[in-house]
Amino acid sequence: MLGILVVLLVLGGGVLGAAYFFVLRPMLARRTMIVEPSPSPVQTSTPTIEATPNDVAQKEASVPAEPPAYSAPADAVEFVNSKQKLDGKLAEHYVDFSFYYPNRWLKDSSAGVPGAANFAKVERRLPPDFTQENFAVGWYSSAGSAEADRSVFPTLAAKLSAQFEKSFPGYTKVSESETKVGVYDGYEFRFEGMSRNTSKGDLKLWGRLIFLPPVNGGKNGITLLMLATSLAPELKSVDDVGARGELPMMLQSFRFGKQ
């Protein structure tokens, strides 16, 4: 049975905002937008976070060390963010960054274009259209550093977790903590859920959402949303997301550009 789950999240107002668009497609016809109704598409409402001046301590930003050059394997494709085709919030909150992904992954043509909600989205699939692993890059409005954002990360994570809970059957937030992506300090939460009634049965869903503050005192941070399903044979739990399978390439190669 065909199934589609769409999550559209936008956080704005006050100090912080974020936008992501993720499509988990257990199976979706490529030439039509019509899908069978079970499970029906789910779109979240738009939450808003209002941060008071006391929520964010204006601390001096500590600039992380310059990351070493990434040695890309022969089958890797580089994505370099560009402002050329962006409009709206993505143009307003543009960030220079790059990463590599395997050439067998599919680049989503709906990201990084006018009207898009993500700078980039790439996906590993089983034919014809079953998600195994997914990597999407969005943005959030930052106070300028990990130190300055630290006090509001738990609030932002709680708001996003509440939205995921409404959208994913069997949703559970598993953990929440500070993290690192290479030399960059960040904050993340991990979660589990299900994608039900697909033609391959009920699929386990595991996810990580990482906030990466800007490195040079800018106001635009990056969000990395990673999702995986039990169709990825190397993954057995949420702890494997970004550690096993093919997502590690994206985390290891992610680099901020000039801010």
PLM region spans:
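Beta-strand elements of well-folded, non-transmembrane domains
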Residues: W105, A143, G193-N197, S230
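Ordered hydrophobic segments in well-structured contexts
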Residues: S98-Y100, N134-W139, G186-E192, R208-I210, ...
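Extracytoplasmic/secreted proteins, especially bacterial periplasmic and envelope-associated proteins
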Residues: Y100, S151, T155, K159, ...
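A short acidic-to-branched-hydrophobic micro-motif
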Residues: A120-T155, I222-L227
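Low-complexity, flexible helical/coil segments
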Residues: Y140-E147, K159, G170-E176, L225-L231, ...
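Signature of long, low-cysteine stretches enriched in small and polar/charged residues
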Residues: F153-N216
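Second-shell loop/turn segments in exported
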Residues: L90-A91, S142-S151, S175, R196-T198, ...
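N-terminal targeting sequences that direct proteins away from the cytosol to non-cytosolic compartments
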Residues: M1-P128, E178-V181, G201, G217-G218, ...
